Amino acid sequence: MTETADIVVIGAGASGLGFANWYRELHPGATVLVLEADAEPGGYCKTIVQDGFVWDYSGHFFHFKEPEIEAYLRARMPGQEIKTVTKRSLIRYAGVDIDFPFQKNIHQLPREEFLECLVDLYFRPSSKVEGAPASFAEMLYQRLGVSITEKFLRPYNEKLYAIELEKLDPDAMGRFFPKADVADIIANMRPKQPGAGDGAYNATFTYPAGGAIQYIRALLRDLPPGTVAYNEPVVQIDLGAREVVTPKRRIGFGKVVSSAPLPMLARMTGVAHDASVFTSNQVLVFNLGFDRKGYKNVHWMYFPDRSVSFYRVGWYDNIFDTDRMSLYVELGAPHGAMFDVDALRARVLGDLIREGIVDDHQLVSHHHVVLDPAYVHVTQASLVETQRVRDGLALAGVHSVGRYGGWTYCSIEDNLIETRALARSI
């Protein structure tokens, strides 16, 4: 006999668990079943505790816009030390550390390069003459000029996305791209007040001492036992029979809410789609623990230099001021690239030494993980196909949510806001 559930949720990450909570609050008598392919919850919000270090799969910090959501999570994390931090981010440019974002801090560059950026900013191409930008690269040149684009924004983002910026949509990063016009850039040349943020979406962040998994545990707290089935991947969704198929069983459903990557969901449902438009990068993350403290008063550092293996380094130890340097180091690569992890770890350590982040430190613990997909490539073609596929699936009672279900660039809080709205509407 086929089992049934009012709602089948695919994925026990922030999006799936968030939806399960919102929906059960509105419909206490509903049967909600969450299917998770992995042995543990969290998706990419997993935490590794090793040799006294606490690492996430990568730096998953919450940047709350809605006090209601922050309060909801905090109420379900009793006893957990949670710190709200004013972010300090630096860019390592030609051996000089300047504040993030680059475009608002060009006055910190050596004089000749500052003047170069300023002149190119003033004489940047105009959209009134050249028309609206057709790509992310064109948007950068039109908005910020040649020098700012080519000194930082182009090399950094191409290291991250592992793709030419001409292929990305002009609004590929949405609100996450630090906006700055000429007036902003000039105004930022005034001395900053102590403790002032950088004006970015994540100028402050919130982080629990136990790592990002604490947010997942908060979302699990109110769900009844048996709500989440682990080690149970979905292999097919039979839209005609309205059944979800796993290696263990068939489950009849009223509706499906999926946080799986959209092209995977399209394959599971047999819905026609253009797989070629759904491209992404992958990110190799090294979590590195050292025997003693290193840099202080920095949380992120960005590296546009293409000769440096990584594009970003983050310091966990500077959030809670612990006494041993604890880093996450991120390397971008095209989807499908193969990693020689040992060789890359050695290269990363060499680059950290050359950049002065590591000197005579001893590496005492390490971990790595590959995120694939990591950053999706938002293109004009992917936007159209994403909308078409999601709309078609929704008509069949299958709703695709989250960063990868929406094939977009968004925050964890955005996923909770999105799934709360969906729970209220279906």
Report each predicted region and the residues it spans.
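Glycine-rich, N-terminal phosphate-binding loop of Rossmann-like dinucleotide-binding domains
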Residues: 12, 66, 260-262
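Conserved Rossmann-like nucleotide-cofactor binding loop
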Residues: 15, 40, 263
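Glycine-rich FAD pyrophosphate-binding loop
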Residues: 24-49
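Dinucleotide-binding Rossmann-like beta1-alpha1 core, especially the glycine-rich loop
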Residues: 51-128, 175
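Active-site/ligand-binding neighborhood in enzyme catalytic cores
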Residues: 96, 113-239
